């Protein structure tokens, strides 16, 4: 059966190029949309999402083969709406030119930075949060005054069609265009000469996107992933840490780029934490097999990948504990698992898990835990559980990650006034809030001179007394 997103090969490059050209022409005709116009775009987007939420919920549920409506509301629609409202409240301040200081030697003059739209922005959206990870960057790009092309994931065809229909009702194609299609379409999309390209997805695909963009010298923002660690301190109540880690790990069945990937636990507390985690998970989900609150794995390929991680770990000596051993698995709902006695030779400790499998790693000293993290690629998120402010400061100072959440998981991503982005292999650049506006804007430096031109006193021919005075005052 042909995918509903499939496009005839002959049309891929032609259609994309035509859409891009139409947006480029529209931008050339209106290169600096006023605040009122941008606010109307944002308002229209917000109202359309609210009006069309049920269709989006049903489409996402269909794509996952079981996704809680409440999870979609809380993890996709709510942050999308809140992000739009945040941009609406602050847009005029963000657009205001920023006055800058002019050095004494260059007076009289004034300096300012003005924020201009870049032009046509490309956004490549992943499958795990097909709404939020489209609307979040779209909000920043529209707030900055750009035209936008979105490439939606072929792994979530129902969601892609629903979001495309919604956006087509709100925006003309030369303002916001939604592109559907398989891998070949995505590859062609990444080769378009965008003024900025934002990609969210796997690290190895991010490398390919960056290589494609480099051919056009297109700047990129890459939101990737990695193995985001959680550290449980020696003093934090285990029930508290376990409950919050369980929520972060099981939301969307762990298919979250900032989900805690593994947990570092004081050696003497390892078994107690495992027990607390089991209890916390069972409180959240008394059962998983027929529980509409618990999301399914997106497709058979991802389910098989996760099963292979379990099989590999078990074969190499890990203790693998299914937290729901008595249930008959139905569909693609994979129960949460705990893994102990893990080591670096296991694939589960090398790859981003992206599922409800949680390895536990013992440590004896906090610096040992930090060294373990720092010896590995820099993660997208880091979580620390402990109320000692000295230890909190130590963790912040001696670790690198895209973002940090102290005493909870995931929630830093939902803060509209905090930037979201990775570091190193987990990504580059930021969006959300003001940082999103800046990412999709050109900060243009403007210096304005007055009629009096003191600078002419240092023009050639050189060797004048005033030039020697300037050297003495400023550089010698």
Where are these regions (language model features)?
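ALDH superfamily catalytic-core signature
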Residues: 10, 171, 204-343, 366, ...
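Residues at or immediately preceding the N-termini of alpha-helices
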Residues: 16, 35, 53, 238, ...
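Short, well-ordered beta-strand elements within core beta-sheets of diverse protein domains
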Residues: 25-31, 123, 231-232, 262-265, ...
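Rossmann-like NAD(P) dinucleotide-binding subdomain of oxidoreductase/dehydrogenase enzymes
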Residues: 104-240
């Amino acid at each position: 059966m042909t995918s509903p997103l499939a496009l005839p090969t002959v049309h891929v490059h032609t259609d994309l190029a035509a859409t891009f050209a139409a947006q480029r022409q529209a931008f050339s005709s209106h290169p600096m949309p006023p605040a009122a116009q941008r606010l109307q775009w944002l308002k229209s987007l917000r109202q359309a999402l609210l009006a069309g939420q049920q269709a989006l919920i049903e489409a996402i549920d269909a794509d996952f083969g079981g996704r809680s409506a409440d999870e979609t509301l809380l993890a996709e629609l709510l942050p999308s709406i809140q992000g739009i409202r945040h941009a609406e409240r602050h847009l005029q301040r963000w657009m205001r030119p920023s006055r800058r200081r002019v050095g004494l030697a260059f007076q009289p003059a004034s300096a300012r930075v003005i924020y201009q739209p870049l032009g046509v922005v490309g956004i490549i959206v992943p499958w795990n949060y097909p709404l939020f990870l489209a609307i979040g960057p779209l909000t920043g790009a529209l707030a900055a005054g750009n035209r936008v092309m979105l490439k939606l994931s072929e792994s979530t065809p129902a969601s892609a069609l629903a979001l495309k229909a919604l956006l087509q009702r709100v925006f003309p194609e030369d303002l916001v265009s939604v592109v559907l299609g398989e891998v070949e379409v995505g590859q062609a999309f990444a080769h378009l000469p965008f003024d900025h390209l934002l990609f969210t997805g796997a690290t190895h695909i991010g490398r390919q996107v960056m290589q494609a963009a480099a051919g056009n010298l297109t700047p990129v923002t890459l939101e990737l992933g990695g193995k985001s660690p959680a550290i449980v301190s020696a003093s934090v109540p285990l029930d508290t840490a376990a409950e919050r880690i369980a929520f972060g790990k099981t939301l969307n069945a762990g298919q979250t780029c900032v989900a805690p990937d593994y947990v570092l636990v004081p050696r003497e507390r390892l078994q107690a934490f495992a027990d607390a985690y089991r209890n916390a998970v069972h409180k959240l989900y008394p059962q998983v097999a027929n529980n509409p609150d618990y999301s399914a794995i997106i497709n058979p390929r991802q389910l098989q990948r996760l099963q292979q991680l379990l099989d590999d770990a078990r074969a190499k000596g890990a203790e693998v504990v299914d937290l729901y051993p008595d249930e008959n698995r139905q569909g693609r709902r994979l129960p949460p698992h705990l893994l102990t006695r893990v080591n670096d030779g296991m694939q589960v400790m090398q790859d981003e898990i992206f599922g409800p499998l949680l390895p536990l790693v013992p440590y004896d000293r906090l610096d040992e835990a930090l060294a373990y993290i720092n010896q590995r690629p820099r993660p997208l998120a880091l979580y620390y559980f402990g109320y000692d402010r000295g230890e909190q400061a130590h963790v912040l100072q001696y670790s690198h990650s895209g973002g940090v959440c102290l005493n909870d998981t995931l929630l830093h991503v939902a803060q509209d006034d905090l930037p979201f982005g990775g570091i190193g292999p987990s990504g580059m650049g930021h969006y959300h809030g003001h940082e999103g506006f800046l990412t999709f804007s050109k900060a243009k430096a403007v210096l304005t001179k007055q009629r009096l031109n003191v600078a002419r006193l240092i023009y050639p021919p050189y060797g004048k007394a005033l030039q020697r005075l300037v050297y003495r005052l400023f550089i010698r």
